[in-house]
């Protein structure tokens, strides 16, 4: 765009792309007879990032150097603490799944079946984080669905095909990419049928949803309305083949240990039986002995269990594991809060006794790793409220008394220490 002259006779410069003047933008960068503003540069960067990410999905799955199970496990270790056996099972299953996809075009007498995954473990043990980390590592579209919100088609609530619509939305409605994505269905245990006998009455949010999910997990052509649209009989639908989508289902399965224990105690009778008291066997150890018949007894239909051949169990996180979760992963909570405080030019120190107190509190609440953030947030609330208006604070120290609510954070000023909230 040509330069225009202002009223004060000096040249006013304009962006050659959007036409905004130099006074309407933060920065105007000059080239040979053209100018570009900071807003247009940001927009160009965003377009390039989106296209690079889209190209990366295809590239990541077409490369011969698909991460090995060991490499997948190593990356999971950076984000997820503990659950070693579950990480190994997941690494092998995901590697085999995407290796299978790479060889789909090759003609062979042996057809490789898809191996979907079932994660069993208590709340806050890392089920969702494992699935999220896998999707990030493989650079494929990913969506989390809550099984408790699903109903059979035709009833009030979300039908199962909405899951595929969300997956499409996450990859800008590019069907090829969606067909190689990962779907994580959480709370799968909450749609178990009420008894292990087939239901006579209609169960639209339990067994009925399992039947609907069965087709999706097994592989079907899902009909999804166009971008931003709702289902209508007279409109064209986008057809998505779910055959090559990896489904990971997760749930706490509260009460499954009792089902397993009842079965194993019946079989473990006689002179050669190994006797262990209930106190000696923790829930994680019991869950590792899960069999398909236990899941059927719990309330999952046999057909759905058959479509989830890879079962990984996660144990309850103990105090030591929770303390590691607070500090060791790449995006550990303590590192996040230290970064927040660093933005105020203040150093945050959370002492080991405070970390231990946070872990103990999470165990008491039975929230696992999921409850750690709320405990720290509650402990730091007052100091985060006051800090932006306080002058000269260089460091904040948190001990176990702060976590338990019996004390206040210690503020270190450039001159002398002071307790938060004191005058």
From Swiss-Prot:
InterPro entries: AAA+_ATPase, ATP-dep_Clp_protease_ClpX, ATPase_AAA_core, Clp_ATPase_C, Clp_protease_ATP-bd_su_ClpX, ClpX_bact, P-loop_NTPase, Znf_CppX_C4. GO terms for biological process: cell division; proteolysis involved in protein catabolic process. Component of the ClpX-ClpP complex. Forms a hexameric ring that, in the presence of ATP, binds to fourteen ClpP subunits assembled into a disk-like structure with a central cavity, resembling the structure of eukaryotic proteasomes. This is ATP-dependent Clp protease ATP-binding subunit ClpX. One of its GO terms (molecular function) is unfolded protein binding. It comes from the Bacteria. Coiled coil: none annotated. Zn(2+) binds at residues 15, 18, 37, 40. GO terms for cellular component: HslUV protease complex. Pfam families: AAA_2, ClpB_D2-small, zf-C4_ClpX. Belongs to the ClpX chaperone family. Keywords: ATP-binding, Chaperone, Metal-binding, Nucleotide-binding, Zinc. Gene3D superfamilies: 1.10.8.60, ClpX chaperone, C4-type zinc finger domain, P-loop containing nucleotide triphosphate hydrolases. Disulfide bonds: none annotated.
